Design a protein with these regions (language model features):
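Short catalytic micro-motifs in class I SAM-dependent methyltransferases
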Residues: 161-168, 190
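Conserved N-terminal segment of class I S-adenosyl-L-methionine
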Residues: 1-161, 171-174, 240-241, 266-277
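Short N-terminal helix/helix-N-cap motif within the alpha/beta-hydrolase-1
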Residues: 168-172, 199
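Conserved catalytic loop of SAM-dependent methyltransferase domains
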Residues: 21-25, 236-263
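Short glycine/proline- and charge-enriched loop/turn segments
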Residues: 62-70, 203-211, 252-258
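Hydrophobic/aromatic residues located in beta-strands of well-ordered beta-sheets
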Residues: 120, 187-189
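Short, glycine-/aromatic-enriched active-site segment of Class I SAM-dependent methyltransferases
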Residues: 20-25, 189-217, 222-227, 251-252
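A short glycine-rich, Lys/Arg-flanked "PGG" loop and its adjoining helix->strand segment in the class I
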Residues: 171-186
Length: 278
């Protein structure tokens, strides 16, 4: 029997089983052949799925994440999400600033924010995405630890959307970002919530979709706050945002499958009110 390895975030060896079963390997309906175990750290509260060696720059990895490594497909999937992200930051907080997007993909957010910023930096290992970023005059580097020292302490705002859950060492990842931020600089970080309420309502059907071979880590608000504090950041503030709308949630409950945004029309007669709480 393999010995328990210390948590890579907090070093604790206190672990329990968070989930055991099939996990998603690619798109909906594609599952791992073998049952997988997601562990819950008793020290920091993070969930952890032991991963295999990963080449983040490979086309095969992008196929598992989004089904394609083509910039055009990335834009089609993600352009519609960017306005809400910009609203969360506020355009005034970006004007004449140095903005760094870590794990930026083909650059949907950077493209939107570029008109406000003094400099935009994209951190992205995928070659096809790097080429698209360079064509749009973003500064491009594959990883934070490969950014030249000239940028150390020069970044005003860093963002990283749905990236940290993919990594083997999230603590080192955040420390690398912090090295590049100026004193008082800000980081906006997003990740799926491991306390997603659909896991309560559909513990079997939704769990095998929620847990993924490409997601090594699973955080709730408390675990994420502990992580950023350990990385040296101060005053973490957590808010909850539903990435997909009410229609997607309702159709999950009815059909037990994802449907995306705006599939079900919830307006109309009856005077119904749908309370929606984070």
């Amino acid at each position: 029997m393999a010995s328990i390895q210390p948590c890579k975030i907090c070093g604790s060896v206190e672990q329990s089983v968070l989930y055991r079963g099939p996990v998603r390997s690619g798109r909906f309906g594609q599952s791992s052949i073998n049952l997988q175990t997601v562990w819950l750290c008793g020290g920091c509260g993070a969930g952890y799925l032991p991963s295999q060696a990963v080449d983040y720059a490979s086309a095969e990895y992008r196929m598992l994440v989004d089904g394609s490594d083509a910039p055009e497909d990335f834009y089609r999937l993600h352009d519609g999400e960017q306005v809400e992200k910009l609203r969360m930051l506020g355009t005034g907080s970006l004007r004449d600033m140095v903005l760094m997007d870590v794990g930026c993909g083909a650059g949907s957010f950077l493209d939107l924010a570029k008109g406000f910023c003094k400099t935009t930096i994209g951190i992205e290992p995928t070659p096809s995405f790097q080429e698209a970023l360079a064509k749009k005059k973003h500064e491009v580097f594959p990883y934070c630890h490969e950014v030249p020292d000239v940028w150390e302490g020069q970044v005003d705002v860093a963002v990283s959307f749905s990236v940290i859950e993919h990594l083997e060492d999230p603590l080192a990842f955040l420390k690398d970002i912090r090295r590049l931020l100026r004193p008082g600089g800000r980081l906006l970080l997003s990740t799926p919530n491991r306390k997603d309420w659909l896991l309560e309502f559909l513990p079997d059907d939704y769990a095998r979709f929620f847990y993924r071979t490409v997601h090594t880590w699973y955080f709730d608000a408390e675990a994420l706050s502990k992580l950023v504090l350990l990385a040296g950041f101060a005053d973490p503030a957590v808010s909850h945002l539903h990435r997909y709308d009410l229609s997607n949630a309702l159709l999950w409950l009815r059909d037990k499958r994802p449907t995306g945004l705006g599939t079900l029309k919830t307006g109309g007669g009856g005077g119904c009110i749908f309370p929606w709480h984070a």
